[in-house]
């Protein structure tokens, strides 16, 4: 059984009406960048729980989670209503294999995400370990609207930190926004527009692609390959 610990909310960042980030202090066990845990609340006499990826680097005690409110959901609206000082239950041991140990050496590592699934990549890049085996890294974040690109400032900071090794590209599907490609990731790959915008090829010989997010995007991306 999962070992639950009590965490205390230290910050709530509301990005849009639907998107928010929770920062929590909790005595969790060490985790690997890219992993997830579970958050839970007691609701109507039972613990309601969902899995969420860590956004923060494993060496940062401020545990950060990026969430979307599901209007009819049982847990996410309650999490969105939390205030600093409120308690939330956290599974102490992280899980998941979306980690760099599972990624083979390659020239270019492509990290593709939709929506709140940008979190694992931000954890990996903020930690910055085991990345020397990649010559280039590309972080692509797709959302419906530019306002949904909550972590763009952090992405830009990371791009500067890696001094040319990391390239970032945002994609929006329901409007035109400066600096972003318009459309959906699979179509932009198939047309060659994503590679052109980034300035790097995506191929089986030199690239490895990590996919995180919308299941349809993952299926479509695999079919493009």
Question: Where are the regions a protein language model picked out?
Answer:
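Ferredoxin-reductase
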Residues: 2-86
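Reductase modules of NAD(P)H-dependent flavoproteins
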Residues: 2-5, 140, 145-225
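Short, conserved phosphate/pyrophosphate- and ester-handling motifs at nucleotide-, phospho-/glycolipid
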Residues: 34, 117, 214
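Short, charged beta-turn/beta-strand-edge "cap" motif at the junction between a beta-strand
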Residues: 42-46, 92-97
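Short, compositionally biased
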Residues: 51-61, 100-112
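Conserved S-adenosyl-L-methionine
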Residues: 106, 130-137
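Ser/Thr-glycine-rich phosphate-binding loops at phosphate-binding pockets of nucleotides
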Residues: 114-120
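Histidine-anchored nucleotide/phosphate-binding helix
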Residues: 120-130
């Amino acid at each position: 059984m999962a070992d639950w610990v009590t965490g205390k909310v230290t910050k709530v960042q509301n990005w849009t009406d639907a998107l928010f980030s929770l920062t929590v202090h909790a005595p969790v066990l060490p985790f690997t960048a890219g992993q997830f845990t579970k958050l839970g609340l007691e609701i109507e006499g039972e613990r309601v729980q969902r899995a969420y990826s860590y956004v923060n680097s494993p060496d940062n005690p401020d545990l950060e989670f990026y969430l979307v409110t599901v209007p009819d959901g049982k847990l996410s609206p309650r999490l969105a209503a939390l205030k600093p000082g409120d308690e939330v239950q956290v599974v102490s041991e992280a899980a998941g294999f979306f980690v760099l140990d599972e990624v083979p050496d390659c020239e270019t590592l492509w990290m593709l995400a939709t929506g709140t699934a940008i979190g694992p990549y931000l954890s990996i890049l903020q930690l910055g370990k085991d990345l020397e085996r990649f010559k280039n890294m590309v972080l692509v974040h797709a959302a419906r609207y530019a306002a949904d690109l909550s972590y763009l400032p952090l992405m830009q900071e990371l791009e500067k930190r890696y001094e040319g090794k990391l390239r970032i590209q945002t994609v929006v599907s329901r409007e035109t926004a400066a600096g972003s490609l318009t459309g959906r990731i699979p179509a932009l790959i198939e047309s060659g527009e994503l590679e052109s915008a980034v300035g790097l090829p995506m191929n089986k010989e030199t690239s490895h692609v990590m996919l995180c997010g919308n299941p349809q995007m993952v299926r479509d991306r695999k079919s493009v390959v």
